Amino acid sequence: MDSATTSGAMELVAALLRGRVPPELMGGDGAEGRALVATLAAAVLGAALFVLWRRAAAGKKRKREAAAAAVAEATEVKARAAKGGEDEKAADDGRKKVTVFFGTQTGTAEGFAKALAEEAKARYDKAIFKVVDLDDYAAEDEEYEEKLKKEKLALFFVATYGDGEPTDNAARFYKWFTEGNERGVWLNDFEYAVFGLGNRQYEHFNKVAKVVDEILTEQGGKRLVPVGLGDDDQCIEDDFNAWKEALWPELDRLLRDENDASTGTTYTAAIPEYRVEFIKPEEAAHLERNFSLANGHAVHDAQHPCQANVAVRRELHTPASDRSCTHLEFDIAGTGLTYETGDHVGVYTENCPEVVEEAERLLGYSPDTFFTIHADKEDGTPLSGSSLAPPFPSPITVRNALARYADLLNSPKKTSLVALATYASDPAEADRLRFLASAAGKDEYAQWVVASQRSLLEVMAEFPSAKPPLGVFFAAVAPRLQPRYYSISSSPSMAATRIHVTCALVHETTPAGRVHKGVCSTWIKNAVPSEESKDCSWAPIFVRQSNFKLPADPSVPIIMIGPGTGLAPFRGFLQERLAQKESGAELGPSVFFFGCRNSKMDFIYEDELNNFLEQGALSELVLAFSRQGPTKEYVQHKMAQKASEIWDMISQGAYIYVCGDAKGMARDVHRVLHTIVQEQGSLDSSKAESFVKNLQMEGRYLRDVW
């Protein structure tokens, strides 16, 4: 309805209300005509008012959107200007620049990088510290060298995960850096230090940090202190603090004047805190929300997951088993999400209701309390320097925030204990918390918190007077709940609109006596599929690419080793091979070593594996049952029995794939493979080791381990 039409309608209504009825409307019986006129007047008036309301509402929406866009643009311009101005100021006033790089998977490396930068800013007022995500440092690979040549002093915080791999945000830099041997010596004026984050239980402990440190030295860089080897299996914060204390004297030498008055200044880290505003429920509905879950996003990643419904869920173990393993299918039709065989899926799920209710009780907040959360002040300037991570979307209720974004079940870090101590009203509890976080309390923290696997909520229950405000709780006490990664157990050739997950339930008793239920595995086990209810479960998910891929040539032989849920990617492999065979491809030999406890309890996908054998996608299935029969048999034992066949396949160019537990199974399999190569190839130990390493370098020995 245009403006002319609206105007005409209003004139007609006005005429009717004044009693002036157009003659053309008064045909026939007078009473009937008057009734018709009254009805028409009401209808026209209603339509006109509706149009005016829509126009006013649209105008308000456009104003809100324009205001929001203006604020966003102003904020971005302000940030760019501040960032550029800071760099220019550093160059103009002669202050030295220190770049602090980080490569992080869960946020710990980023947290250490920002914490060090904050403390360094307080120690060295004549230097500027800039914290940089390695992935954001260069838009193109070629820019890495160009930019690094301009750096004089840099600190690297890099984590290692999986099978000695870099984190997602460091992968591009690491690939460029490790493949550039032809650069020679080019970092002559470059000084650096590296701190690594890893877990000593894994075979390639801190591999990424060690490699980066070694190559920096080889290419001319000057190492300030030995590479720091943070061990998350113990207390990685202690490792970080020890490395940091060794670093300060070197930075003092480079960044301080002899008469610097701040030399003896004691630094006390501020407790990070988001700005939180509590709002009424009726106000929450009028505020814009940005959950970053809109399906059809150009790129789905950890920051931009898509919403996927659970289509299928079924138990894979038999009733005779005392454990549980779930087959789950996410429906990705219409989401824009795609995957390849061998990829991983990242799943964001929620803490279970009883855990959330306990957190609400300990914090003292009503579950339905609405609030907004911000990393800046009301005037737009950032809070706490640069140490705060971007907050989660809001407005949100306390219950939903605790369910979706707070890691409540892992053991608290020492920085969390310090934050709790600050807000403990009982002096004795505050002192105890500070002691556990101190160097003097190192052994007790290691025993009472780490070894006992006490969760954050268990620790908070022991210190009930510690009730931090929400802004502190989410910034300094509870880490952000991280996505859980699973090897996709399907192939798009067979299931293009579904992502299959094979998940073992985590349900165990900790040394402190708590029954620990895995956050994601519990959610998966209890998920409601769409085949059972229209009100089905859903989760934000995304795909992470993997190099765990079948050979490009399907005729190349493959050896697969994957007990338990390590079967997952191989189910996808075999679906892919079956599709290739049905398309006329000639398949090479394939053998799969699978293990479980008992064929009557946890032999998952048994019928499917037998079908792959019958259809020719799989040549041989070798089974190992650890709790069936007089002796325990594992996949590595079966490999030793098949040593000759394995060596023959390797000699024919076979690819070897291992999936499953990194701490036990993968190590044992690696040792057996080394023995097979040594004995079957008549090689000494060092040559056998070189042979296996070459297989890895050639991409013929791949591992998907956790």
Swiss-Prot record:
Function per UniProt: This enzyme is required for electron transfer from NADP to cytochrome P450 in microsomes. It can also provide electron transfer to heme oxygenase and cytochrome B5.
Residues involved in NADP(+) binding: 323, 565, 626-627, 632-636, 668
Family annotation (Gene3D superfamilies): 3.40.50.360, NADPH-cytochrome p450 Reductase, Chain A, domain 3 (1.20.990.10), Nucleotide-binding domain of ferredoxin-NADP reductase (FNR) module (3.40.50.80), Translation factors (2.40.30.10)
Record field: transmembrane: 33-53
PANTHER family, per database record: NADPH--CYTOCHROME P450 REDUCTASE 2, NITRIC OXIDE SYNTHASE-RELATED
Cytoplasmic side: 54-706
Binding site for FAD: 484-487, 502-504, 518-521, 706
Record's bilayer topology term: Single-pass membrane protein
Cofactor detail note: Binds 1 FAD per monomer.
UniProt-listed InterPro entries: CysJ-like_FAD-binding (IPR003097), FAD-bd_FR_type (IPR017927), Flavdoxin-like (IPR001094), Flavodoxin/NO_synth (IPR008254), Flavoprot_Pyr_Nucl_cyt_Rdtase (IPR001709), Flavoprotein-like_sf (IPR029039), FNR_nucleotide-bd (IPR039261), NADPH_Cyt_P450_Rdtase_alpha (IPR023173)
EC number: 1.6.2.4
Catalytic activity: 2 oxidized [cytochrome P450] + NADPH = 2 reduced [cytochrome P450] + NADP(+) + H(+)
Residues engaged in binding FMN: 104-109, 159-162, 197-206, 232
Pfam families xref list: FAD_binding_1, Flavodoxin_1, NAD_binding_1
Compartments reported by the entry: Endoplasmic reticulum membrane
Protein name: NADPH--cytochrome P450 reductase
Gene: CPR
Stated family: Belongs to the NADPH--cytochrome P450 reductase family.
Residue span, Flavodoxin-like domain: 98-248
Cofactor field: FAD; FMN
GO MF annotations in UniProt: flavin adenine dinucleotide binding; FMN binding; NADP binding; NADPH-hemoprotein reductase activity
